């Protein structure tokens, strides 16, 4: 009828067909979990995995992190073949380890080695949260302790990038022992005048935050990183108080004196270079036997 021409029609959202969705290959687009903007993955990678819209720092894997801070081609890996066993015979643990090895092409949740930043030699460790959520087991602790000892032997600074859910429950007390072992190694390095820079990324929690991650001569963090020991809900239930919205964020810790700086990923390499340059030939570089 003619009358129907003037009736306001309902608007419906166009739903892409299954064929249209299939035409976009996996991995081409990435959705930011903070601002929900969808962007080309290639664009995100070019921007060091920082959202171009809101500045959210997406997680980096170990190799991406190393590429972003070290001189090209300078990295030499340590202890690549070390793998975790199942000393407590925890059900399903070996299968989970093997699954993560295939998924990440890593043998463990940390990559250690040496490289240069603007031709200054450093020993570096980078935790990778894709492997068992970056949890600290006996091999993770051993690799970090060995890396610190190598920095001590070479008389060069040690830098670590942390990203971890804490101690690995499948290894029980063997996991908790790594808190003491890594701390003792760092104390020896410090007593000899060695420089240690800790960079906490999202998330750095549990036994990792309560040990080596917080022991740096410089404690840095990326914007928005979650840093803390116990979870927010556990703390609120214990103290029976509502915690601030920004509690356990890098910015909150900086405001309360627990960090030296919050450094944007774009500025991380330059910030590390400046710190290393300050300590070249300075008091921290005077090694003691």
UniProtKB/Swiss-Prot annotation:
GO-annotated cellular components: acetyl-CoA carboxylase complex
Enzyme class: transferase
Protein localization: Cytoplasm
InterPro entries the UniProt entry points to: AcCoA_carboxyl_beta, Acetyl_CoA_COase_Trfase_b_su, ClpP/crotonase-like_dom_sf, COA_CT_N, Znf-ACC
Cofactors: Zn(2+)
Assigned keywords, A-Z: ATP-binding, Cytoplasm, Fatty acid biosynthesis, Fatty acid metabolism, Lipid biosynthesis, Lipid metabolism, Metal-binding, Nucleotide-binding, Transferase, Zinc, Zinc-finger
GO biological process, one term: malonyl-CoA biosynthetic process
Residue ranges occupied by any CoA carboxyltransferase N-terminal domain in the UniProt entry: 28-289
Main localisation: cytoplasm
Cofactor note: Binds 1 zinc ion per subunit.
Transmembrane segments: none
Reactions catalysed, as given in the entry: N(6)-carboxybiotinyl-L-lysyl-[protein] + acetyl-CoA = N(6)-biotinyl-L-lysyl-[protein] + malonyl-CoA
Pathway: Lipid metabolism; malonyl-CoA biosynthesis; malonyl-CoA from acetyl-CoA: step 1/1
Binding site for Zn(2+): 32, 35, 51, 54
Protein EC: 2.1.3.15
An MF annotation (GO) of this entry: acetyl-CoA carboxylase activity
Complexes and interactors: Acetyl-CoA carboxylase is a heterohexamer composed of biotin carboxyl carrier protein (AccB), biotin carboxylase (AccC) and two subunits each of ACCase subunit alpha (AccA) and ACCase subunit beta (AccD).
Cited NCBIfam families: accD
Family as reported in the entry's similarity comment: Belongs to the AccD/PCCB family.
Role: Component of the acetyl coenzyme A carboxylase (ACC) complex. Biotin carboxylase (BC) catalyzes the carboxylation of biotin on its carrier protein (BCCP) and then the CO(2) group is transferred by the transcarboxylase to acetyl-CoA to form malonyl-CoA.
Official protein name in the record: Acetyl-coenzyme A carboxylase carboxyl transferase subunit beta
Source species of the chain: Bacillus cereus (strain ATCC 10987 / NRS 248)
């Amino acid at each position: 009828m003619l009358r129907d021409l003037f009736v306001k029609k309902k608007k419906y959202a166009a739903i892409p067909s299954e064929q249209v969705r299939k035409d976009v290959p996996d991995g081409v687009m990435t959705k930011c979990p903070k601002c929900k903007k969808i962007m080309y993955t290639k664009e995100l990678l070019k921007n060091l995995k920082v959202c171009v819209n809101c500045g959210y720092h997406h997680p980096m894997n170990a190799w991406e992190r190393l590429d972003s801070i070290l001189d090209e081609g300078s990295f030499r890996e340590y202890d690549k073949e070390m793998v975790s066993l199942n000393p407590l015979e925890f059900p399903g643990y070996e299968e989970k380890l093997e699954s993560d090895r295939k998924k990440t092409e890593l043998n463990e949740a940390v990559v250690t080695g040496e490289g240069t930043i603007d031709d200054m030699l450093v020993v570096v460790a980078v935790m990778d949260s894709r492997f068992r959520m970056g949890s600290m087991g006996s091999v993770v602790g051993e690799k970090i302790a060995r890396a610190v000892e190598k920095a001590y032997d070479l008389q060069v600074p040690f830098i670590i990038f942390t990203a971890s859910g804490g101690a690995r429950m499948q290894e029980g007390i063997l996991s908790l022992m790594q808190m003491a072992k890594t701390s003792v190694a760092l104390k020896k390095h410090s007593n000899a005048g060695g420089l240690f820079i800790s960079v906490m990324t999202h998330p750095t929690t549990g036994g990792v935050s309560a040990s080596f991650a917080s022991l740096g001569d410089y404690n840095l963090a990326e914007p928005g990183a979650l840093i803390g020991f116990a979870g927010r809900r556990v703390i609120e239930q214990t103290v029976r108080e509502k915690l601030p919205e920004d509690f356990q964020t890098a910015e909150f810790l900086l405001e309360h004196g627990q960090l030296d700086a919050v450094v944007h990923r774009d500025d991380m390499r330059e910030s590390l270079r400046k710190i290393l340059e300050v300590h070249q030939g300075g008091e921290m570089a005077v090694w003691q036997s």
